[in-house]
């Protein structure tokens, strides 16, 4: 199973927290000390906590669970999308729309509209419209694709959230808490770990650190999914005898 070592984390700068004046005292158990007014995260804590989170995500994936990757900060946006797509999962990487989980019924209608517009753009409907109308629909399609493209094929609520930056994505975490969906999150020294089921204390800004987390999660999810596919193949093989 995918695991991450202390050396990998040091190389990626996972241990660098935020400036000491911005800290959240709830993160004290995970802080090693401070250097040049910047908190240093205790990787002796992070390594086992991250590997425990990976093992749990592996289990969820092996049971056909759907994992929603959430990271809407500009620096992490593309990496979040790439990681989710690389393991056939789902993502929100631009803006978290309030109610995305708690008001799923409305979101589902917007997804239906997105899919209708996609069909229209491909089957020649747009070409039959006036220029103005076609432009309006193209803009609507782009807007919907931007906000819902990563969840349009999710087909219902996710079974887990993997979040980059618990502070930035607090609305998503709150919605998941309300629905009892487990939250796995990177929690930096300025963030509140409450509401996160699997806390991963670490730097949530450095792109190398973010890429490290996402790569490991995507790998463990792929592995979990292949176990699920292997067991399905075994079952069908037994039935065929």
Swiss-Prot record:
- In terms of superkingdom, the source organism counts as Bacteria
UniProt keyword Ribonucleoprotein present = yes
Matching CDD domains: RPS2 (cd01425)
| Alphabetical GO biological process terms | translation
* One cellular-component annotation, GO: cytosolic small ribosomal subunit
Instruction: Specify whether Ribosomal protein is a keyword of the entry.
Output: yes
Annotated InterPro entries: Ribosomal_uS2 (IPR001865), Ribosomal_uS2_bac/mit/plastid (IPR005706), Ribosomal_uS2_CS (IPR018130), Ribosomal_uS2_flav_dom_sf (IPR023591)
Any one GO molecular-function label of the UniProt entry? structural constituent of ribosome
Which key words are in the record?
Answer: Ribonucleoprotein, Ribosomal protein
Q: Which family does it belong to?
A: Belongs to the universal ribosomal protein uS2 family.
The protein here is known as: Small ribosomal subunit protein uS2
Q: Which organism is it from?
A: Escherichia coli O139:H28 (strain E24377A / ETEC)
């Amino acid at each position: 199973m995918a695991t991450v070592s202390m050396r990998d984390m040091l190389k990626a700068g996972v241990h660098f927290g935020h400036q000491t004046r911005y800290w959240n005292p709830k993160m004290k158990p995970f802080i090693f000390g401070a250097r040049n007014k910047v908190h240093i995260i205790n990787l002796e804590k992070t390594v086992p906590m991250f590997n425990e989170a990976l093992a749990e995500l592996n289990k969820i994936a092996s049971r056909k669970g759907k994992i929603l990757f959430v990271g809407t900060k500009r620096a992490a946006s593309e990496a979040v999308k790439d990681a989710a797509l690389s393991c056939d999962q789902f993502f929100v990487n631009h803006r978290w729309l309030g109610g995305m989980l708690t008001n799923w019924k409305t979101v589902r209608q917007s997804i239906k509209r997105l899919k209708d517009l996609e069909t229209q753009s491909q089957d020649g409907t747009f070409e039959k419209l006036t220029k103005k109308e076609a432009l309006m629909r193209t803009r609507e399609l782009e807007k919907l694709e931007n906000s819902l493209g990563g969840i349009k094929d999710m087909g219902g609520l996710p079974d887990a959230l993997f979040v980059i930056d618990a502070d930035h994505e607090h609305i998503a975490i709150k919605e998941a808490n309300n629905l009892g969906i487990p939250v796995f999150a990177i929690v930096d020294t300025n963030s509140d770990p409450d509401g996160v089921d699997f806390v991963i204390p670490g730097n949530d800004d450095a792109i190398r650190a973010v890429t490290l987390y996402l790569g490991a999660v995507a790998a463990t999810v792929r592995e979990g999914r292949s176990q699920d596919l292997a067991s399905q193949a075994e079952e069908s093989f037994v039935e065929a005898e």
